[in-house]
Amino acid sequence: MRLDQVARSLLLKEFVSGFALAMRYLFKPKATINYPFEMGHRSPRFRGEHALRRYPNGEERCIACKLCEAVCPAQAITIEAGPRRNDGTRRTTRYDIDMVKCIYCGMCQEACPVDAIVEGPNFEFSVETREELLYDKQRLLANGDRWEREIARNIAADAPYR
């Protein structure tokens, strides 16, 4: 053994430097959070569970233009449009999203001209069966009603960058 190796092993240099490093981090604030009880910060651009939004008067926003269906790379969206109304507008009779196929790319949200389909802030939507991940229009509208306040706040925060 060389002399420097003997000195290091006798003086326990590695042990002391490791202990000093541990003591340094002991007094710093913790970097981890206790997840189920504490929630970390999410960006306004976070892409979570899908939702269909309504106008303040309660009418659904979707105008059945089918741009989201056309732009979806996973082909997870299926839309059927109803007949035109007396005022010339259309609404959907069927709006389905297969969340198993969805890759959460956000292209449907980008393509929508009236901000009807959005990816909301909810990421805790575990299910027991695969069929529960087939979202129909009623479930999407219920998600929109439940998360509307936070969705509107996120869209407003992101508006300068769109």
From Swiss-Prot:
InterPro entries the UniProt entry points to: 4Fe4S_Fe-S-bd (IPR017896), 4Fe4S_Fe_S_CS (IPR017900), NADH_quinone_OxRdtase_chainI (IPR010226)
Chief subcellular location? membrane
| GO cellular-component term (any) | plasma membrane
Reaction equation(s) it catalyzes: a quinone + NADH + 5 H(+)(in) = a quinol + NAD(+) + 4 H(+)(out)
Q: What class of enzyme is it?
A: translocase
One Gene Ontology biological process: aerobic respiration
List its EC numbers.
Answer: 7.1.1.-
Entry's Gene3D superfamilies? 3.30.70.3270
Q: Where does [4Fe-4S] cluster 1 bind?
A: 62, 65, 68, 112
- Where is this protein found? Cell inner membrane
Q: Which domain of life is it from?
A: Bacteria
Give membrane topology per the record. Answer: Peripheral membrane protein
- In this chain the 4Fe-4S ferredoxin-type domain maps to 52-82, 93-122
- Note one Pfam family from the annotation: Fer4_7
- Swiss-Prot/TrEMBL cofactor(s): [4Fe-4S] cluster
- Residues where [4Fe-4S] cluster 2 binds: 72, 102, 105, 108
Which family does the similarity line name?
A: Belongs to the complex I 23 kDa subunit family.
Q: Outline the subunit composition.
A: NDH-1 is composed of 14 different subunits. Subunits NuoA, H, J, K, L, M, N constitute the membrane sector of the complex.
Protein function: NDH-1 shuttles electrons from NADH, via FMN and iron-sulfur (Fe-S) centers, to quinones in the respiratory chain. The immediate electron acceptor for the enzyme in this species is believed to be ubiquinone. Couples the redox reaction to proton translocation (for every two electrons transferred, four hydrogen ions are translocated across the cytoplasmic membrane), and thus conserves the redox energy in a proton gradient.
What's the protein here called? NADH-quinone oxidoreductase subunit I
